[in-house]
A protein has these predicted regions:
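All-alpha prenyltransferase/terpene-synthase fold signal
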Residues: 1-148
Length: 148
């Protein structure tokens, strides 16, 4: 396994040190992928750009979908929808409602995103802070809906 380090070559030689950015890059990558999975199933903006719940049409085992499958292993509903790869909204809407209301997969996904965002921001801080990365995290932030 390759360890990625970035030397600060612009610093005086006596202050030269290396920082390990792998944990930060891993956190950002995981956060972004889970966020993308959630947005694909919930965001009207994603629907405009990529189509409605395209991950279901493509049969993808996204983060909320995997949670929904594991939340009730006796119910094969989500697996059946993934196998059918529906192009029309009817089955997709039903599956999204199931993931939201029955398995609470979107709530779980939001909680994981909140935790990953906090870890990412802490890692940015540990590495000395970075206004540009903090701004990116602000832009990627997903509001957790109020629980009823």
């Amino acid at each position: 396994m390759c360890k990625v380090t970035v030397p600060y070559s612009t610093i005086a030689a006596d202050e030269l040190h290396e920082s390990d950015y792998v944990p930060l890059v891993n956190l950002i990558g995981i956060y972004f992928q889970i966020r993308d999975d959630l947005m694909n199933l919930q965001s009207t903006e994603y629907t405009k750009n990529k189509g409605f719940a395209e991950d279901l049409t493509e049969g993808k085992f996204s983060f909320p979908v995997v949670h929904g499958i594991h939340a009730d292993t006796t119910n094969r509903q989500v697996l059946n929808v993934l196998q059918k790869r529906p192009a029309t909204p009817t089955l997709k809407v039903h599956t999204i409602n199931y993931l939201r209301d029955q398995t609470k997969s979107f709530d779980y996904t939001h909680s994981v995103l909140d935790s990953l965002e906090a870890q990412t921001r802490q890692e940015i801080k540990r590495l000395g802070g970075n206004a540009a990365l903090e701004k990116i995290m602000d832009l990627l932030h997903v509001e957790t809906p109020e629980l009823m």
